[in-house]
Structure formats: C-alpha cells, structure tokens
Curated annotation (Swiss-Prot):
Annotated residues for binding of [4Fe-4S] cluster 2: C156, C160, C163
Family indicated by similarity: Belongs to the methylthiotransferase family. MiaB subfamily.
The keyword 4Fe-4S is assigned to this record: yes
Domain Radical SAM core: 142-374
Record note on cofactor: Binds 2 [4Fe-4S] clusters. One cluster is coordinated with 3 cysteines and an exchangeable S-adenosyl-L-methionine.
Domain MTTase N-terminal per the UniProt entry, residue ranges: 3-120
Catalytically driven reaction(s): N(6)-dimethylallyladenosine(37) in tRNA + (sulfur carrier)-SH + AH2 + 2 S-adenosyl-L-methionine = 2-methylsulfanyl-N(6)-dimethylallyladenosine(37) in tRNA + (sulfur carrier)-H + 5'-deoxyadenosine + L-methionine + A + S-adenosyl-L-homocysteine + 2 H(+)
Cofactors demanded by this protein: [4Fe-4S] cluster
Protein name: tRNA-2-methylthio-N(6)-dimethylallyladenosine synthase
General function of this protein: Catalyzes the methylthiolation of N6-(dimethylallyl)adenosine (i(6)A), leading to the formation of 2-methylthio-N6-(dimethylallyl)adenosine (ms(2)i(6)A) at position 37 in tRNAs that read codons beginning with uridine.
GO function terms (MF aspect): 4 iron, 4 sulfur cluster binding; metal ion binding; N6-isopentenyladenosine methylthiotransferase activity
EC number: 2.8.4.3
Record organism: Marinomonas sp. (strain MWYL1)
Subunit structure and binding partners: Monomer.
Length: 451
C-alpha cells in the first residue's frame, strides 16, 4: 500500500509552489500519495513562513499537536521546512525533539535522502543556501487544474529593513532560462492554461540562456507566451526599482500578460520609505505606475502596506492614504508592523501604540475595499473573459473563474466540461469580494475565439 504524505503550508505563493514540488519529489522517489488527513500520514511536512509576527509560535503550536501523533506511531516522520526552518535551524529540535528533518527552501530537493535517514531514526538538518541547484533535482511537475505556479528565482538582495527574506531564503539567484521553459512546457502538456511566474523579487530575474545571453522577466514572459496551450501569464512579487522599461513594454505588447499588477509600495511617506530602505521615493513610484497605466489602460493594481512602521506619524499615514486614492489600488495585503528578529528595523523603537496601528489599518482597508467595490460596480453589464477553475465553494450549482484583472466570478452552470476552459460571462452583480455573472459563451462553442 502506498505511503501517505501530509503537507501543511503557511505563507506565500512561493511556499505553495515549494510544497507542490515536495509532493512531486516524494511521489517519484517513495511513491507517496498526498492526503488531507494528518492522522493517516506516514510523513508530515510543515512548510513555514516567518514574515509575520509570532511565526515561530505558530510552528511550535502545530508541532505540539503532531507530537501526539508521533507518540502513537514512533515510525511517523516529521519534517519542518521553509523560512522558520532557515531561521531557527537546530533550535527547532531543541524545543521539539520529535522533529526528524529540518530543511530550508533551497534544500527541499534533498527530501528523499532525508526521509531515508529519518526512517533509520537519524535526525538531519540542512538549511544551507546552495546555488539554485534544487531545480536540477526535481522531477517533472504533476498538476491538476488549469493554473500553475512556476518559480523562476529565489531570494532577495534588497535588504529592506523590515524584511527577513534575505536571511531566510538568501540573496537573489535566477533559474536558467531554458529550465523555466521546460517546466512550463511540461505543465502545458498537462492542460495548464495560466502560468503564474514567482519570485521574492521576480522582476529582478536575470537568467542565463543556452546561448550564453542574459534574459530578464520580459524575455521570460514573451517566451512563455509562445508555448502551445498557455493563454495567460501572471507574475508576483515585484519591486518598483526593478520595474524595467522592457517589462512596461511587455504590458503594452503581450496580450497574454494579464491586466493585473501587484507592486508593493509599503508606505506613501518618503521618510518611512527611506527608513525602510526601499530604494525609491513616493514620486518615483507614482511615475512608474503612470507609465504602466499608459502602456496598459485599465490595469488593476494591488500593493502591500505596512502600517505603524517605527516613526510613522499621523501625517505619514495621511500620505499613504492619499497615495492609495491617487493610484486607485483595488486590493492590498496590509498588516500592522511587527518586529522581525534579526532585521535592522528590529533595533528601532516600535513607537506606535498597537491600538493606533489597528485603527489606521482598519481605515486603510475600508478605503481599498470601497475602491475595489466601485471598480467592481463599473464592471456590471460588461462581458468578461474568465478561466474556469472549478465549482464555487459556497454553491456547488455555480462554477467559478477569474478575470484578467484578478476578480472572482461565480455563475450558474452545470457542465463539468467547462472546468479548465475559458468562457465569456456578462457581469450581473457586484459584491465586495466577487462578481456574479451569466454565461454567454465558452470554448465548448464552435465559434468561440480565444484571442
């Protein structure tokens, strides 16, 4: 009987991608099958994130629950990966002696030998930052569905004062150009229609081609667009300083690149941006966005915001709110500031009271929610092209898909053959976090035109 693998993933899309590759790896090496029930698993993996406050506490709390499973089954193998593993290393095992394997994002390709060692009750830790060798050791991806992530680079070299990523994932290392395209081809052959290119600082990508040239993110986008079966391309996460002219031109000239961009700004106040060492000021960001809007009219924009960074005044927060209105963001990942151990900002006085941080955050989120709702209302009556991902989790009588500008659309339909296909829906109603539509055509129709 096949052994069972359970993976719990915390954090970003990079971690989601890494978890899927862990499953591919152990599926090939040990013929393991994924399960969503930890109690029936032979191997438990916790893929961790250290971006937010109390990340370590969250990890140890989960490991405490898994300890009970280990007591019932001493042969159960428990592994901790991801960014908390990189930060904590062997300290994890000092607090949780039942953990067999500790590995970082760059060493997950060694999981088969780690599992073998754990089977002999040999604990192992490897949180090193080797060159981007893991992709040379991973099997072909196995996917279900029409959308897939593809990691094109690892790490970040920006060293923003609040961020742990350079310390947990290492500095920027780009994956070879042809390695990326090979993975995309493998995904497209399995029916993937939308490719989401990933990197902690994805637009800093500078990868070698087989001809000895250097490719950037725009080159990747144009090459992926030429692969049979791929109809949509997204990328996350970008840095304003790395947003090149060639990438702006990709928005102008590449129709398969979607009309949505996530470009973190963190704050709208120049003194806070300087304290964060973001490498740009407010006006630089505005100018960059205006050029992107000129290249792709109607593009949907989202961003990251940190509220209550050390030194943030009421006036600084007003600057952030004014920037949100000027740019017209319709979504954000926004959080109150919390000190991350080992970062330069952790040496600064966290001088904004928590209740003030939370009040500012609520104001910001209300503003962006209203802007998002206004944009959604403006879409009512329009026909939108969506990629259908599956059934609505709230209503099995509805199918669900995503628009180019990253909005979820639910519509009444009962044909499972539509899943994984493109369709046109007319938007009939707008809600705070989704749209409702009616099907007007799909790839199942003989006269449907993709482009």
């Amino acid at each position: 009987m096949a052994k069972k693998l359970f993976i719990q993933t915390h954090g970003c899309q990079m971690n989601e991608y890494d978890s899927s590759r862990m499953a591919d790896l152990l599926g090939e090496s040990h013929e393991m099958e994924l399960t969503d029930n930890a109690e029936e698993a032979d191997v438990l993996l916790l893929n961790t994130c250290s971006i937010r406050e109390k990340a370590q506490d969250k990890v140890y709390h989960q490991l405490g629950r898994w300890k009970k499973l280990k007591q019932k089954n001493p042969n159960l193998v428990i592994g901790v990966g991801g960014c908390v593993a990189s930060q904590e290393g062997d300290a994890i095992r000092k607090r949780a002696k039942h953990v067999d394997m500790i590995f970082g994002p760059q060493t997950l390709h060694k999981l088969p030998e780690m599992v073998n060692a754990a089977g002999k009750h040999i604990p192992i830790t490897d949180v090193t930052f080797p060159e981007i060798e893991k992709f040379d050791h991973l099997p072909a991806p196995r996917v279900e569905g029409a959308e897939a992530f593809v990691s094109i680079m690892e790490g970040c070299s920006k060293y923003c004062t609040f961020c742990v990523v350079p310390y947990t994932r290492g500095e920027e290392v780009s994956r070879p150009f042809d390695s990326i395209l090979k993975e995309v081809v493998q995904l497209a052959e399995q029916g993937v229609r939308e490719i989401h290119l990933l990197g902690q600082n994805v637009n800093a990508y500078r990868g070698d081609t087989a001809e000895g040239d250097e490719a950037d993110l725009a080159d990747i986008i144009h090459a992926v667009a030429q692969i049979d079966g791929v109809e949509r391309i997204r990328f996350t996460t970008s840095h304003p300083v790395e947003f090149s002219d060639s990438l702006i031109e990709a928005f102008r000239n590449e129709p398969k690149l979607v009309s949505h961009l996530h470009l973190p700004v963190q704050s709208g106040a120049d003194n806070i941006l300087s304290a964060m060492k973001r490498g740009h000021d407010r006006q630089y960001y505005i100018d960059k966005i205006n050029r992107i809007k000129e290249a792709r009219p109607g593009i949907s924009l989202s961003s990251d915001f940190i509220i209550g960074f050390p030194g943030e005044t009421d006036d600084d927060f007003v600057d952030t709110m004014n920037l949100i209105q000027e740019i017209g963001f319709d979504h954000s990942f926004s959080f109150v500031y919390s000190q991350r151990p080992g970062t330069p900002a952790s040496n600064l006085e966290d001088d904004t009271p928590e209740d003030v941080k939370k009040e500012r955050l609520a104001i910001l989120q209300r503003r962006i929610s209203q802007q998002a709702y206004d944009i959604s209302l403006s879409m009512v009556g329009e026909v939108q092209r969506i990629l259908i991902s599956g059934y609505s989790p709230r209503d099995p009588g509805q199918l669900q898909g995503r628009t180019e500008n990253n909005r979820i659309v639910n519509f009444r339909a009962f044909d499972p053959q539509l899943i994984g296909k493109f369709a046109d829906v007319v938007i009939t109603d707008a809600y705070p976090n989704s749209l409702l539509g009616e099907l007007v055509g799909s790839e199942l129709d003989s006269d449907f035109v993709l482009q």
